[in-house]
């Protein structure tokens, strides 16, 4: 098996390269907050020498309640993304939910994300593929790791081979997710880069009746475990005031802890990738 390397400017995304951080906030709450969070991530990752891609959503289209905050929408969201990109010279990742969003979003961001709940929607997959952008595929909570090959094939047949696979937990009964560490290793066997969404994997879906709950107190332990697999990247969301975040606050890392958190993740990644491979199948 060979590891595929995806190039994003000077950044190399691959399972055998130093990890790349996809990080930011869950949903754009305001222009000022987005700029503050982007600046904190940019300064921290530059200090630690971690390749970095800024992440936020312009629309959370799958909230538990119709009354929940969704975001500023695509038009306003893309304006904020353009300002972040030009101000901090950062590559960007965001998610799309509808076919008509793919082309305009691809003009601004560098990586388009396929949401887990929509990962089998063929028309959306084809529209995303045709943009030529790098694609981050969230593994659905209801799919086995080996089933990701079918989604890869759809993108390939639509003309796109720039694919990243993202683990975000698997359904475990009602209102609970667990992370299958061997499943992430199984996805690595495809050769495509695998990243670990360590904050969404902390969710308790529907755990607060009209929104998702979470287990923020275990954010470090879960991320350390994932990084021990030797992955292409880590996906996290942070907020300066998680208890008052407009979406997924129970899973968000407190922003003031970002440097300490990433220092540990980089140490684990550096250590694991310094080891020689051991083939225990023989």
UniProtKB/Swiss-Prot annotation:
The listed locations are: Cytoplasm
* Any Gene Ontology CC annotation: cytoplasm
Q: Which GO terms describe its molecular function?
A: 3-deoxy-8-phosphooctulonate synthase activity
Enzyme class (EC, first level): transferase
Task: Write down the chemical reaction(s) this protein catalyses.
Answer: D-arabinose 5-phosphate + phosphoenolpyruvate + H2O = 3-deoxy-alpha-D-manno-2-octulosonate-8-phosphate + phosphate
Q: In which pathway does it act?
A: Carbohydrate biosynthesis; 3-deoxy-D-manno-octulosonate biosynthesis; 3-deoxy-D-manno-octulosonate from D-ribulose 5-phosphate: step 2/3; Bacterial outer membrane biogenesis; lipopolysaccharide biosynthesis
EC number(s)?
A: 2.5.1.55
Q: Keywords in UniProt for this one?
A: Cytoplasm, Lipopolysaccharide biosynthesis, Transferase
Extract the Pfam families matched here: DAHP_synth_1
* Biological process per Gene Ontology, one example term: keto-3-deoxy-D-manno-octulosonic acid biosynthetic process
Q: Report the superkingdom from the record.
A: Bacteria
Q: Tell me the protein family, please.
A: Belongs to the KdsA family.
PANTHER family recorded: PHOSPHO-2-DEHYDRO-3-DEOXYHEPTONATE ALDOLASE (PTHR21057)
Q: What is this protein called?
A: 2-dehydro-3-deoxyphosphooctonate aldolase
List the source organism. Answer: Shewanella woodyi (strain ATCC 51908 / MS32)
Identify the coding gene: kdsA
